[in-house]
Amino acid sequence: MLRALKGHVESPLIVVTRAASTNAEKLEEIRERLAKGPNFQDFVQNPDYSKSEWENYEGKLRREKGEEQRLRLPPWLKTTIPMGKNYAKIKNQLRELKLSTVCEEARCPNIGECWGGGEHGTQTATIMLMGDTCTRGCRFCSVKTARKPPPLDENEPVNTATAIASWGLDYIVLTSVDRDDLPDGGSKHIAKTVKEIKARNSNIFVECLVPDFRGDLGCVETIANCGLDVYAHNIETVEKLTPYVRDRRAHYRQTLKVLSEAKRFNPNLITKSSIMLGLGETDEEVENTLKDLREAGVDCITLGQYMQPTNKHLKVIEYVTPEKFKHWEDRGNQLGFLYTASGPLVRSSYKAGEFFITSILENRKKRQALNSKPEQ
């Protein structure tokens, strides 16, 4: 899903979605809403489509077996062209710093909202660690692959933490390529980055979207106990489709095991996963996947539309309607997820989700502080 530009090996691969509001009153309003415990949907309402616009859509939404022709993009997946002062500022800063942005290369549908500021002016960033080359080749992902990618940059943890500290962010997401060529899968490198970030700013919330480390529980424990706040690992699709969608080394049950063990190693963690829809899955299979994730103790789930990155990747089987995504949002809430983000343009590191999780973590800290106070 992510890929970086060539030629900047020494720099961390950074996707900045810094959208700082210039309106003090607006920021104060957001803080007040967080303090009162907002609903996640307060942050993810998409004004670009309404039921009246998609309900009467007569275009084809599903490819039949054997059909080669690609489906046309329905109206609810069409987004506005990125623009605005914040967008231009972010883009220029990245160029000046010679930092690579996977937002652009992956053609993320939310780039205009994130870089342009969005409705709430949230300040988040996503950083991709350990290079731009993955040892795996999932059929939905456009990251380049190799059996033995270049060695890790040993300065990356410090450089990344220093950059983050200077930005004054509230929430950071660390993601990475798979590095099966390394004995520990890069787990110590990721853990060191988290520790360096926390050493500079203990108040920043850190989410790690990590690989499965081949199911090595020692690596999972390293990440779970490194000081992060959110442990994320994506299941991607339903069990039946996993061998066709993900790399052969990725296993459905292994993903569930990683998520459940992360919670066992550190019960205070928030755990998170993501499902792509539109690959040919049935409603029953999605339902079972949601139940499996809840049984594994997963707290947060995101569901979004699969989008074919290039002609070489898996074709979209179906464009799922906003109504169906709303159904899965309701179902996730019924099953007891801490939050369910479900929508055509929702992605696993959707910034509004980060904003909402921040409020959850802040409330947890407040409760822990109150509970730790000695009785008078």
Swiss-Prot record:
Q: Where is the Radical SAM core domain?
A: 119-338
Q: What is catalyzed by this enzyme?
A: [[Fe-S] cluster scaffold protein carrying a second [4Fe-4S](2+) cluster] + N(6)-octanoyl-L-lysyl-[protein] + 2 oxidized [2Fe-2S]-[ferredoxin] + 2 S-adenosyl-L-methionine + 4 H(+) = [[Fe-S] cluster scaffold protein] + N(6)-[(R)-dihydrolipoyl]-L-lysyl-[protein] + 4 Fe(3+) + 2 hydrogen sulfide + 2 5'-deoxyadenosine + 2 L-methionine + 2 reduced [2Fe-2S]-[ferredoxin]
Report the cofactor remark: Binds 2 [4Fe-4S] clusters per subunit. One cluster is coordinated with 3 cysteines and an exchangeable S-adenosyl-L-methionine.
In Swiss-Prot or TrEMBL terms, this protein is called Lipoyl synthase, mitochondrial
Annotated binding of [4Fe-4S] cluster 1, by residue: 103, 108, 114, 349
| Coiled-coil spans in chain | none
Q: Name one GO molecular function term.
A: lipoate synthase activity
State the organism of origin: Drosophila ananassae (Fruit fly)
Q: Where is the major localization of this protein?
A: mitochondrion
Going by the UniProt record, its keywords in alphabetical order are: 4Fe-4S, Iron, Iron-sulfur, Metal-binding, Mitochondrion, S-adenosyl-L-methionine, Transferase
